Each structure stands twice: as structure tokens, then as C-alpha cells.
Amino acid sequence: MNPPLTMHRAQGAATTMPPTLPQPLRLLETSPTPPASADVVVIGGGIIGVFTAYYLAKRGLSVALIEKGRIGAEQSSRNWGWCRQQNRDARELPMATRSLELWDQFAADSGEDTGFKRCGLLYLSDDEAQIAGWAKWREFAITAGVTTHMLSGSEASERGRATGRAWKGGVFSPSDGTADPAKAAPAVAAALIKLGGTVHQNCAARGIEMEGGRLSGVVTEAGTIKTRAAVLAGGAWASSFCNQLDVRFPLATIRQSIVRVAPLAQQLPAALAGPNVAVTRRPDGHYVLAISGRGRADPTPQLLRFAPQFIPMFAKRWRNVFPGGLEGMRWGHETRARWKLDAPTPMERARILNPTPDPAGVRETHRRAIKLLPALREARIANTWAGYIDSTPDGVPGIGELPQVPGLILAAGFSGHGFGIGPGAGHLIADIVSGATPIFDPKPFDPARFNASAWGKVADF
């Protein structure tokens, strides 16, 4: 559970909140001891890892899910909770569309509650160029079977009446929605256990064993699991893990800060993106406030190593990505150091990445949200938090088998988009592992594009 929340106010200063875990996560009773063998080992208990393990178990495979800390405790519980097709990069749109179907199907099949609902997502703007961009995206989306509605000035102003002002235009995607980051990953892990899969928390994967030129086991702090297939869904830790295997996987982790405020008597829109801030209503009535793409790039050895590949991304997002501090060095998730398989690793010293929120980012997010929705002025700040977004040079994930390590499937670099597309990504990865026909084309996600410097344009957040 979260530590008790306390509020500190220096005389004449604004209220600040100590860093906390986002919300109490569902506590799963799991075995600390992994099995001696499994058909597949999934490394990482975030939304990608749990859905991958779930779909593998549905195919009758024995699956061991290994998590160094708690299921869903890092970025999978620190995001907005949006599950969207609207404004998706073309490379991710098929994954997003199928994911919405799979969110619904998961609830029906498992009986578990992820908090998913198709509440619709509302975007408002006074920027004519942005509105024109949405209209252009809509033309493309129609060819992909996506329903989205452009809003005139009067329609946008009516849907956005809680803002108390008029708008030039907007867009509404009725089939999109949100899920609850505090519930989702633990719910999927619980469904995995019902299917016979095993989940092992506080059990870090330290590395792999090879035999006959391919993966033969996953070494954990509690022993080795013999297997012929493994999935690395390690989020912000994936690149440093790959480095242990002499695999170059460029990641930059961006520290994003989020504000959560208490419920209000007036019900505000379920999911609203204004010109420079987004507000999301959670099932418990609290509101989550965030600025899309805003964060701090904490300098680390890994960031310096991959900096040249991220120049296009930082050039595109320079207005929102700011230089950070030593927070990244403190956690060790971007180390270039090699670790031993028979000794504690950085992952065991930092079971849960819980970085400090950026005070300036918190203040600016709160200010913008109140300007967008004046009613939020009456809502007290419940807590703030930060998380590390694992971003690739083009903002599109890397999914595929690593040729240097046959049998190891990489699934990381979801670049702040991973929560909503978790079901589709998990299904695709399960297809790759089991040799089934892919649910959609995996080619845009091939990690080999980074080795060849052949990635495409930088995706939007």
C-alpha cells in the first residue's frame, strides 16, 4: 500500500506533496519460488508482460512470469489509463484497434475487472493547424475502419462546456476509452494464475543461459528456469538487460510527473485533452492531470551512449523534454555496467522504480489543468508521482526475436503508448512465440531497424 500521505506547507509557499506510489495496487498472493522449467518465461510484470503471459497460457503453454518487484508497480500503474485509436501513429493503429476489442474480450473471458470502459476521448483546440491535422488523420483512419467525429466550434464548445469557454474545434472518438492503471496489470496476472500460469514477485531475472546456440534457461535470483523461449518485457530496464547479452537496444527513459486530485461534486469529462494538458477521471472519482510528452531526460551512461540516435526525437519535442538531474543515476536502470549472475543486480537494489516528481512540472501541470477546467481549483491535490517512460528513437516499440539470442523475444520501448495497446501487443508476442499467424503485421516493430538506422519518422506521444 501507499505510505501515508502528508502535506507540507512552508509559510508563503505553494503546497507540495512527497513522492508516493500512484495508488494502492491489488495485492496478489504469488509463489516466491519459480518452477524448475517452463515452456515460456516472461520477464517483467507490467501490462505487456502480463498480457503476453496470459495469451500464452490460453494456448495451453506452461508460463512463468517473473517480476523483480510487484506486478504493475512501475509505468503500468503510473500512466493516464487511455486506451485510444485517436491520433495513433499509422504503425500502431492496427495494434490499438485490436487492443480495444481485446480489452472487452478479456473482461468477458476472465471475469476480472481492469476498469476498462469505452467512455470516448475528447480533444479540444483553438489551433487551426492542429484541427486540420486531426481532420487529415480522420481521413486515414476511415480507411482503417476507425470511427472518429470532427467537431465544429459549436459542437466542441458544447462537449467542452465544463471548460466555461468557446472552442474553434475538436475531435471525439466514441469507441476509445480508459482502463484503470491501479487495477489492470494485477487483474491480468490473476487471470493468468487461474489458467495455470505461475507468477513470481520479488524475483529478478538476472540473465539467460545458452545451449547449442540458443536460449536454454532464464537465471533468476531464486534459481534457473529451464526453457526454450523467453520474453523480455522489462520496460525501462530492457536496454541494460540487453547490454548484458551484447545486444544494442537504444532506449531513453523520460521521467514524467503526474498530479492526482480529489473528486469533485461537479462531474467533469471522463477523458479530455486540451491544447496543453489532459485530464482523466478515474473510477474512484479522482482526476489525473498530465502534460503529453512533458518530462525530464535524466543524464545516464545509457542516455549518453544512445544520444545521437535520439537527436530527431529531442528536436521534435524540445518544447516539452527538459534536462534532468541525477535521479536516473540513483536508480541504476540505465547502467552500462555488467553484472554477475550469482550476485545481486541493480534490479534487486531497486525493486520498484519510484522516481521523484519534478516540482516545476507538477506546478505547471496543475496550473494548466485549472485553466482548462476551472472547477479543478476546488479539488485538493491528493498525491503526485513520476514514472520512467521507455522510449525508442522513433517512439514505436521494439517487438521481435533477437537474432543474437535465438529464443529470446524483445518487447519493450513502448514510448508512453504501451498501456492502452497492452492486450494487442501481448497477443502479438504470444503469436510470435507460439508460431501462430500474427494478429497483425509485426514488421513495423522489428528491433533490427535500430541496428540499421532504418526507423521511420518520430511518432507523436
Language-model regions: role of each:
Residues M1-V40, K58-R59, W455-V458:
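Extreme N-terminal leader/targeting segments of oxidoreductases
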Residues G44-G46, K68:
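Glycine-rich Rossmann-fold phosphate-binding loop(s) that bind the pyrophosphate
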Residues F51, I208-T335, E348-P359, E364-L372, ...:
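Flavin-dependent oxidoreductases
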Residues A57-S77:
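Glycine-rich FAD pyrophosphate-binding loop
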Residues G332-G456:
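C-terminal catalytic lobe of FAD-dependent flavoproteins
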